[in-house]
Amino acid sequence: MVNSNQNQNGNSNGHDDDFPQDSITEPEHMRKLFIGGLDYRTTDENLKAHFEKWGNIVDVVVMKDPRTKRSRGFGFITYSHSSMIDEAQKSRPHKIDGRVVEPKRAVPRQDIDSPNAGATVKKLFVGALKDDHDEQSIRDYFQHFGNIVDINIVIDKETGKKRGFAFVEFDDYDPVDKVVLQKQHQLNGKMVDVKKALPKQNDQQGGGGGRGGPGGRAGGNRGNMGGGNYGNQNGGGNWNNGGNNWGNNRGGNDNWGNNSFGGGGGGGGGYGGGNNSWGNNNPWDNGNGGGNFGGGGNNWNNGGNDFGGYQQNYGGGPQRGGGNFNNNRMQPYQGGGGFKAGGGNQGNYGGNNQGFNNGGNNRRY
């Protein structure tokens, strides 16, 4: 059953209280699906009715504006088991209330600040490879996540030796998301590092903006949080700056470590990719202005509120406990008139900024 309760942030949360929570053995982020591009008429009930075809749903929510109580055009589905997400993703495309929606595995809250956490890509970077990691061993392992179309083990042109990393390309973005969510991977008994591989041109999009200015929001052009001043935490428009060195200490272009992809706020990444306009067809959207939630032109109808490049700035979505994972579900927005975020960034729309700024007036929601 769906219990629709209005909480302080104006969201309608549906939770199946009849499901035995002690039967859940996986972390919530492994069972949670982000749904973008929702029609403004879609309710918790409609969302659940569609996705329960692929498994038991323990939580469902269509995110709403805390003031207007209107849909923001996206929501979350939490299943009782991660395999149900696999089945739902195999059944794409999904159409709800006459509109094709874009489901994507939700990013864990601890990974929100990663510059490429919400990117939609089909190529996977695999680092820390050893000499015994050949193409076949890589294929044998990663083919369980999806259909592989190409494997490229990078070789030093001068010495002919392996440089310690490779790229695995799938025919879909979902296998990449699933691999990255799992985090720890062993090939031939040895741990390897996995990350989303972003094209170089993605580093250049988004323009100025930055994170400065009142309320911790964009200082330059509102709506441009990515590109040069925000996502490129390691400098430059280059994949190969900073992080762990997988290239035999060569430096320069051999660095493929933490945050080494730069990222920025643009380029088809984020939740939705491309130039999808989330919510601009809703009757209350006229004149609301920008509000980038995903980079690459993905507009989430937030009246000029910049949601920070393509980082997962919805805070990973509302959390509900299952088994030993997040048993205490905190209200995403707690407190009085200011709706100041509480509970360790539970459900915040703004990454590091603990909430989002209402059109630059320094009032926090």
From Swiss-Prot:
Biased composition (Low complexity): 1-13, 241-259, 277-286, 299-313, 354-365
GO process terms (BP): compound eye morphogenesis; female germ-line stem cell population maintenance; negative regulation of RNA splicing; oogenesis; positive regulation of mRNA splicing, via spliceosome; positive regulation of translation; regulation of alternative mRNA splicing, via spliceosome
Main location: nucleus
Record localization: Nucleus
Stretches with biased composition (Gly residues): 205-240, 287-298, 314-324, 334-353
Pfam families, alphabetized: RRM_1
Residue ranges of every copy of the RRM domain listed in the record: 31-107, 122-199
Single GO cellular component term: ribonucleoprotein complex
Listed PROSITE patterns: RRM
Gene Ontology molecular function: any one: mRNA binding
Annotated segments matching region Disordered: 1-24, 191-261, 276-365
Keywords on record: Nucleus, Repeat, Ribonucleoprotein, RNA-binding
Function: This protein is a component of ribonucleosomes.
Protein's name according to its UniProt entry: Heterogeneous nuclear ribonucleoprotein A1
Lineage, opening ranks: Eukaryota, Metazoa, Ecdysozoa, Arthropoda, Hexapoda
